[in-house]
C-alpha cells in the first residue's frame, strides 16, 4: 500500500503530487525485493497531478524490470515526450527534476510549518497549532530562501516556454499535469 497522497496527521498532502519518482522507485523496488509481488495498492487523491507518478507505480507493478535506478530519468522523459511532444518533453525534463527536488526539501503543503494536535505547540481554539513562518533563512547558508524561490522562478519560466511547444489538443493535460503543480508549489514557497 503506497501513498501518492495522504490525508491525516500531522499534515496531509492531497493538493499536488510531490512524491519524487526516485522515492517511489526505491520503496516499490524494496517491496518487490521483500516478496510483495501479488498485489500493489496505491492511494491517490487527484489523478491529474499524479498522472506521471501513478504511471511509474503501475509500470513497476506490471514489470518491475521496466524501470531501474539508472533509467528512471529516461522513463520520466519518455512520458513527458509522449504526453506533450518531443520538444516540450525534452525541455520539461530538467524543470520537472528540479520540481521534485524542491518538493523533496519541503512539500509545498507543509510550508506553513503548522502541526495539528501536538502538545508542544500553542494551540488555537480550532484545535490546530499556530502557523509560524518557514525556517528557511534569508541570510544563513548563502541566502537559502532566495535560492529556493529563484529555483521555482526558473522552472516556472521553463514550463511557460515549454507550454508554447505543446499542441492545442494537449494544453488541458499540460495544465493539469505540469503547470498547475509547478505554479501551485511556487505560490506556496
Please report, for each region that a protein language model flagged, where it lies by residue.
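Catalytic-core regions of glycoside hydrolase
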Residues: 1-67, 71-77
Amino acid at each position: 500500500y503506497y501513498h501518492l497522497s495522504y490525508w491525516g496527521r500531522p499534515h496531509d498532502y492531497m493538493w499536488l503530487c510531490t512524491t519524487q519518482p526516485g522515492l517511489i522507485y526505491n520503496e516499490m523496488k524494496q517491496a518487490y525485493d521483500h516478496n510483495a509481488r501479488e498485489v500493489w495498492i496505491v492511494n491517490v487523491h487527484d489523478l491529474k497531478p499524479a498522472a506521471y507518478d501513478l504511471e511509474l507505480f503501475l509500470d513497476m507493478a506490471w514489470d518491475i524490470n521496466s524501470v531501474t535506478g539508472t533509467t528512471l530519468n529516461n522513463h520520466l522523459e519518455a512520458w513527458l515526450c509522449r504526453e506533450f511532444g518531443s520538444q516540450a518533453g525534452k525541455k520539461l525534463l530538467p524543470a520537472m527534476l528540479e520540481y521534485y527536488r524542491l518538493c523533496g526539501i519541503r512539500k509545498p503543503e507543509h510550508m506553513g510549518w503548522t502541526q495539528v494536535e501536538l502538545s508542544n505547540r500553542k494551540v488555537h481554539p480550532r484545535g490546530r497549532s499556530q502557523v509560524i513562518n518557514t525556517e528557511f533563512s534569508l541570510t544563513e547558508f548563502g541566502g537559502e530562501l532566495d535560492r529556493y524561490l529563484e529555483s521555482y522562478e526558473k522552472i516556472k519560466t521553463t514550463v511557460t516556454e515549454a507550454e508554447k511547444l505543446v499542441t492545442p489538443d494537449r494544453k488541458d493535460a499540460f495544465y493539469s499535469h505540469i503547470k498547475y503543480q509547478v505554479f501551485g508549489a511556487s505560490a506556496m514557497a
